């Protein structure tokens, strides 16, 4: 199982990975502040943050869970736990 992933946002502080996203962009949420969600794209020397609505983040996380279940992924329990802690 892979370890948790964190990033530091210049304004909102620590973010943790909620779900992998599409096109190399992952979904992160604020760790300490009010729940805000970001679509994060990491390129060679730059990190791009795009604020996304709660329902979009939840939908993407649900799609990731379905994909992990279909594939029988070893990380399924990790994503289920993160989904429960973040959205339920």
Each predicted region: which residue ranges?
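A short beta-strand micro-motif
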Residues: 5-9
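Ubiquitous "structural anchor" signal
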Residues: 20-21, 32, 80-81, 87-88
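Short, aromatic- and cysteine-enriched interfacial helices/patches
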Residues: 12, 39, 82, 86-88
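Acidic, low-complexity, intrinsically disordered interaction modules
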Residues: 11-71
């Amino acid at each position: 199982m892979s370890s948790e992933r964190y990033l530091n946002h210049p304004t909102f502080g620590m973010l943790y990975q909620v779900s992998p996203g599409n096109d190399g962009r992952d979904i992160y949420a604020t760790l300490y502040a009010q729940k805000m969600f970001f679509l994060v794209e990491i390129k060679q020397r730059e990190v791009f943050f795009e604020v996304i609505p709660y329902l979009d983040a939840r939908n993407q996380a649900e799609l990731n869970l379905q994909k992990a279940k279909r594939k029988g992924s070893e990380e399924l329990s990790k994503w289920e736990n993160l989904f429960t802690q973040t959205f339920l």
